[in-house]
Design a protein with these regions (language model features):
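Flexible, acidic/histidine-containing loops and adjacent segments that form or flank the divalent-metal
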Residues: 28-52, 58, 108, 115-116, ...
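Active-site metal-binding motif and surrounding structural segment of the metallo-beta-lactamase
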Residues: 69-74, 79-166, 302-319, 331-335
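Long, structured stretches of catalytic cores involved in phosphate-ester chemistry, encompassing
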Residues: 297-397
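N-terminal cofactor/phosphate-binding cores enriched in small/glycine residues
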Residues: 63
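Active-site metal-binding loops of divalent metal-dependent hydrolases
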Residues: 78-81, 127, 237, 282-284, ...
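N-terminal export signals
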Residues: 5-27
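Metallo-beta-lactamase
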Residues: 75, 80-81, 271-314
Length: 435
């Protein structure tokens, strides 16, 4: 019996008496979870008209690959850092540790990308190594123009992939809201080297992410065919988009600070595809101190400007994030997250995500992994009823929205190998259909 089989058998007792995720009649379209007809089969390839996001599991960082309805593609983050050195806090590194994350991610993208190795957009949510790679961890180094480049994260993936345009919060001056190097843990230096290299090698274009913009991230191949698809930039550099389209600077009081929390600088998006809505905002969570000595919760301020969505990526991997007002504002039917640590999706976060006081509707919490140690620790907690059991074995989470946006599917795909075998799937109707 291997470690994973032992874990499966050992966890039966703690889970007895915990209900499985339930489906409200009217938002389920077919059998769910392990009984779904896709289980055991290869994940179907993207088809024109679908909006698909792959939350790629590596166990060491965050990465998402988007395929938009007309085939426009985007790699959002490509993290790698020494998470495997965290001892008992580490989660499974999959498929194995023989390759670094950047290479695994590039191989995954090439399998599912209709354009194979060509990717329209690269976007880095913020300058942290678990989202971009770092100088001290990777598949070696290379010399270029008098610089030593770390083959890690984004740069390693770019050995196989070619990006046309890149969005970054700091480009070109890297000084908003304060000089970005004051927030740097090494990832910014790594990224700036990678950008310079890819601009010279591939002619990659750089753009500053504009908070408040609608359509900066645009369909590049046949936008006219999908007028109901739009991406709105809602957060970045500590600013948020208000409902009226204006922009509020949450850090206006801190422009002379010596250091700021990089997580609060994260880039955030809301996608609308017909009736379907999706939210993602990197690690957007911070509690900066105000001039009067009190603290402001950035998620609470953002919540005032948001409406409900169908699927939401959990902020900051669920590490003491997702304030109750934000959960209540988003009211997601499905919550998902990229995970690389036992401390991700902490119990307090899960309690808020599962709170029926925040909103009464059923919901599915579908992280890339919900590790065994956490299940022992949280045995008997009510929030376990909302967690997808497929996460117990870890896997890629793939969201596929049908053409037009009326229905969507969330599937787990094995990360143990590159077979793309589906291990569980859930079908839903977008909430505003028929509203």
């Amino acid at each position: 019996m291997n470690r994973r089989d032992f874990v499966k058998s050992a966890l039966v007792a703690p889970l007895l008496g915990v209900a499985l995720p339930v489906v409200a009649q009217g938002d389920a379209c077919s059998p769910r979870g392990a009984k779904h007809p896709l289980v055991g089969k290869k994940l179907p390839a993207w088809k024109p008209g679908e909006f698909q996001i792959h939350f790629i599991y590596t166990g060491v960082g965050e990465s998402m690959f988007w395929i938009m309805p007309d085939g426009t593609t985007m790699l959002l983050d490509c993290g790698d850092h020494p998470a495997i050195n965290r001892g008992k806090l580490a989660v499974w590194v999959l498929p194995n540790g023989n390759r670094h994350a950047g290479e695994w991610i590039a191989r995954y993208v090439t399998r599912v990308n209709p354009a194979k190795t060509d990717v329209d957009y690269l976007m880095i949510s913020h300058h942290h190594d678990d989202h971009a790679g770092c100088p001290s961890w990777g598949a070696g180094t290379r010399e270029w123009n008098g610089r030593t480049l770390s083959v890690s994260g984004v740069l390693q993936a770019a050995d196989a992939l070619k990006f046309k345009t890149c969005f970054d919060r700091g480009w070109p001056s890297f000084n908003e809201p304060i000089p970005n190097e004051l927030c740097d843990d090494g990832a910014l230096r790594h990224l700036r080297d990678a950008y310079a290299y890819l601009m010279e090698r591939d002619g990659m274009k750089m753009e500053k992410f504009e908070v408040g913009a609608v359509g900066q991230i645009a369909l590049r191949h046949d936008a006219a065919a999908f007028p109901g698809f739009a991406i709105t930039n809602i957060t970045g550099n500590g600013k948020i988009r208000r409902r009226d389209g204006s922009v509020r600077d949450l850090y206006a009081h801190a422009h002379n600070a010596k250091r700021l929390n990089e997580n609060g600088m994260s880039l955030g998006l809301v996608v609308q595809y017909g009736p379907f809505r999706f939210y993602s905002a990197g690690d957007f969570y911070d509690t900066p101190k105000l001039p009067d000595g009190t603290r402001m919760n950035t998620e609470v301020e953002l919540a005032k400007e948001l409406d409900s969505v169908d699927v939401a990526k959990i902020n900051h991997h669920g590490h003491h994030s997702m304030s109750l007002p934000l959960v209540a504002a988003l009211k997601a039917r499905v919550w998902t997250a990229c995970m690389w640590d036992q401390l991700h999706i902490t119990a307090d976060t899960l309690e808020r995500l599962s709170s029926r006081e925040a909103y009464p509707d059923p919901r599915l919490v579908a992280p890339g992994v919900f590790p065994p140690e956490r299940r022992f620790e949280d045995a008997g907690k009510p929030f376990l009823a909302d967690i997808a059991r497929e996460s117990f074995d870890a896997g890629h989470v793939v969201m596929t929205v049908a053409p037009g946006g009326a229905t969507y599917n969330v599937a787990y795909v094995t990360a143990d190998d590159e077979s793309m075998k589906v291990t569980g799937a859930y079908d839903f109707m977008s909430r505003s259909v028929g509203a």
